[in-house]
């Protein structure tokens, strides 16, 4: 150990960082958080649905308690990211694992910001964040704390990546709010239609706000990426798969937010369904480019990549939910 400290003192982590990493690995915070997030998010969702059918003081009190639990989980998530930042010595969004943790953090944070008066928003964002954390702990994602890759050793990591990856947070919130809105439309009947209409209208407004914030961040992040590309490779744009799909995502969400100006594409069902479908462009930009396509931003090696089975089930679920909710929307809402 003495020889390591004498000869490698420039790269050897300090004793405090070693102790911090031991604590970090022992706690295994993020692996635990996704279970707590999922449980609390699901329970809060059902409590809010029950409160729509019949308001009770006990339910409102319980819902308020769950909100504070989510605030606590968000604080723990933030503390975990800060601890990982301290241990690694770089911003915690430099690889696949860290970026998923960051997107989950941005999703809950946006849910808290937009869900001050909407329990559905808070519950939904917490649940979808738990799914992101669950994905981060699959066996194909490496959770180890590693040295920063030389190509990422730039101040732009703090700026470009933070903004563009952070934009996935509000866009994820928009997607899950679209799902919840269609679920509420599906559950609507003659007895609860008035309350359901209010909830769907509220969620649609918040959804539009979330998508607007996400689109602004995504656009700014793309321009910042061009600045970094110019410094690194001597050009602002090279039609790299990541750059191309980021541009496609911008165009897709710009269309979704302006659909109300197109005759025949107005209405809450159309907007909410479009917010779900549009998220496929983000999935392609993040997961698809990283693991399927070969480029400057990707991890793909040219080997065959097997698409997880749950992707096909998710696609089928979206189609079924869209069809049933459209039938209910035409029958009950018009």
What are these regions (language model features)?
Residues 1-44, 55-57:
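Extracytoplasmic
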Residues 187-200:
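Membrane-interface interhelical connector segments
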Residues 1-8, 138-139, 152, 156:
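Generic secondary-structure transition motif, activating predominantly at the C-termini of alpha-helices
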Residues 30-53, 63-90, 94-146, 159-186, ...:
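Hydrophobic cores of alpha-helical transmembrane segments in multi-pass integral membrane proteins
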Residues 4, 8-12, 174, 191, ...:
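Residue-level signal for secondary-structure boundary elements
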Residues 13-28, 146-161, 300-305:
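Juxtamembrane membrane-water interface segments that cap and precede transmembrane helices
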